[in-house]
């Protein structure tokens, strides 16, 4: 059983996101450990990219900071290896398609060997006539990495049916239109949207994009099977808070504590 499947067996997981290499290798690893101590059950590690169009200003700046630290594909592997020395937490690579396409299938096997369990490719074309993405899904399968896929409030039925045949581990529901960022509350139609998705998907459904406090996490868990916090953590890293402070902040969001 994949570590991600195990994470959903007894709880509704708290999923955290950090951009790999933000603040440098050592700080990035220390902050990842801090999130684990703060209650995070699954960790997404962002692969820094020069054109992160799906992200809002907070995470865009994190990509820039990480690239200035010379974070590259090897750094991402080393971060995972460092975490695997002491932790069995599920790891998801959060990436744009282009860097992975450029690296080729061999890199996916390197990700698996380093300790990653899944890949979420935010701008991946879902196969219809896109031969490249079809081969990418095949490469993920061969590397034994789960494809984590995104859906939005506007994803149409035909697309949902296609995605339901490909997604594994969990479905990532983008709970707000637009880019990543911090929002004060979930959308008014959140429960309706989750109910709609359950007609198509048997895997767990988690909510992300905008969850930044305990109140929105509680609201998400009323209907979803887990929740993701990203921008709220990344904003703290921009301020160079200590790992201890980051642990405390994560605990303040987690409604299960």
UniProtKB/Swiss-Prot annotation:
Top-level taxonomic group: Bacteria
Sorted UniProt keywords: Amino-acid biosynthesis, Aromatic amino acid biosynthesis, Lyase, Tryptophan biosynthesis
TM helices/strands, residue ranges: none
EC number(s) on file: 4.2.1.20
Pathway: Amino-acid biosynthesis; L-tryptophan biosynthesis; L-tryptophan from chorismate: step 5/5
Active site: 44, 55
Catalytic activity, reaction form: (1S,2R)-1-C-(indol-3-yl)glycerol 3-phosphate + L-serine = D-glyceraldehyde 3-phosphate + L-tryptophan + H2O
GO cellular component, one term: cytosol
InterPro entries: Aldolase_TIM (IPR013785), RibuloseP-bd_barrel (IPR011060), Trp_synthase_alpha_AS (IPR018204), Trp_synthase_suA (IPR002028)
Family matches, as PROSITE patterns: TRP_SYNTHASE_ALPHA
HAMAP family membership: Trp_synth_alpha
Recorded family membership: Belongs to the TrpA family.
Record note on quaternary structure: Tetramer of two alpha and two beta chains.
Function: The alpha subunit is responsible for the aldol cleavage of indoleglycerol phosphate to indole and glyceraldehyde 3-phosphate.
PANTHER family: TRYPTOPHAN SYNTHASE ALPHA CHAIN, CHLOROPLASTIC, TRYPTOPHAN SYNTHASE, ALPHA CHAIN
Protein name: Tryptophan synthase alpha chain
Upper classification of the organism: Bacteria, Pseudomonadati, Chlamydiota, Chlamydiia, Chlamydiales
Gene: trpA
